[in-house]
A protein has these predicted regions:
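Short, surface-exposed loop or secondary-structure junction motifs
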Residues: 1-130
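Structured C-terminal helix/loop/strand segments within mature extracytoplasmic catalytic/sensor domains
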Residues: 135-186
């Protein structure tokens, strides 16, 4: 076989000096990690482990879930994405990134390969450009990168604490993203 996704990501993260951004964080991170949900399936409060049940079944490592980080480390990743958009191959070759951010051909879909694209209903609000890409997490996280405006927004919350039955994030995300973009742009 090949290289596991967590090992491949750790190699990239080290090369880019992303710091605290990784799958399956060490137990030493738990005191500074926000808890998520009192999970009835696992019978305990989750903290420092993947929340997504499918991701947990896959050992805490999956392409759609399980990455832990700080605002600073996610911001460093966003900076690497912006540099790749500008032609400097930081996280991938620019042509590879272009493929990953290409909107799917499904009518009305905002999805790309691992990314969401801007729509009027997007979680990123209305201030980012049409070239913005983003990814949201069920637990209340999001990252939106706008190459046209050369900015990014990182939002890390624990909206599922103490339970997943909290939909306030759906209104909060667009508001926060819009407020940040308005504060950063002339």
């Amino acid at each position: 076989g090949g290289v596991r996704i967590d090992q491949q990501f750790a190699s990239i993260a080290d090369e880019l000096t992303l710091g605290d951004l990784r799958f399956r964080p060490p137990c030493a991170w738990r005191p500074r990690t926000a808890p998520t949900e009192v999970d009835p399936w696992r019978g305990r409060l989750l903290c420092g482990e993947v929340h997504d049940e499918n991701g947990w079944a896959l050992g805490g490592v999956a392409g759609h879930t399980g990455l832990f980080g700080t605002v600073k480390s996610v911001g460093r990743f966003a900076q690497a994405v912006l540099k790749t958009f500008s032609g400097e191959p930081k996280i991938a070759q620019p042509a590879t990134l272009a493929r990953f951010v290409e909107r799917s051909s499904v009518p009305g879909s905002s999805r790309a390969l691992g990314w969401d694209r801007m729509l009027v209903t997007s979680s990123c609000g209305h201030q980012l450009s049409g070239s913005a890409i983003g990814h949201t997490g069920f637990t209340g996280t999001s990252l939106w990168v706008d190459p046209q405006q050369n900015l990014y927004v990182v939002l890390l919350t624990n909206r599922v604490h103490p339970t997943r039955h909290n939909e306030a994030i759906l209104q909060l995300r667009p508001y926060v993203h819009d407020a940040i973009v308005q504060a950063l742009t002339p």
